[in-house]
Amino acid sequence: MSEVINVNCPTCGKAVVWGEISPFRPFCCKRCQLIDLGEWAAEEKRIPSEGGLSDSDDWSEELK
């Protein structure tokens, strides 16, 4: 018999079974999934970086 793995929904904290029974995992529902997506889209969440971009990084919006 396999062990049931439970995780907490990152949005609301509700327990979620990690398996096919939970189609929105790690979220408990579509609503929590969309709340999280909205936070990423609004840049309320981000992956931390060690440094910023500088002018010498050859990033340009100009067409060549």
Curated annotation (Swiss-Prot):
Bilayer-crossing regions: none
Job of this protein: Inhibits all the catalytic activities of DNA gyrase by preventing its interaction with DNA. Acts by binding directly to the C-terminal domain of GyrB, which probably disrupts DNA binding by the gyrase.
Matches recorded under Pfam families: YacG (PF03884)
Keywords (A to Z) from UniProt: Metal-binding, Zinc
Quaternary structure and interacting proteins, as annotated: Interacts with GyrB.
InterPro entries per record: DNA_gyrase_inhibitor_YacG (IPR005584), Znf_NHR/GATA (IPR013088)
Molecular function, one GO term: DNA topoisomerase type II (double strand cut, ATP-hydrolyzing) inhibitor activity
Family note: Belongs to the DNA gyrase inhibitor YacG family.
Residues that hold Zn(2+) according to the record: 9, 12, 28, 32
Keyword Metal-binding: yes
UniProt superkingdom: Bacteria
Organism in which the protein naturally occurs: Enterobacter sp. (strain 638)
Cofactor section: Zn(2+)
Cofactor: how and how many bound: Binds 1 zinc ion.
Name assigned to this protein: DNA gyrase inhibitor YacG
Keyword Zinc tagged: yes
GO biological process: regulation of DNA-templated transcription
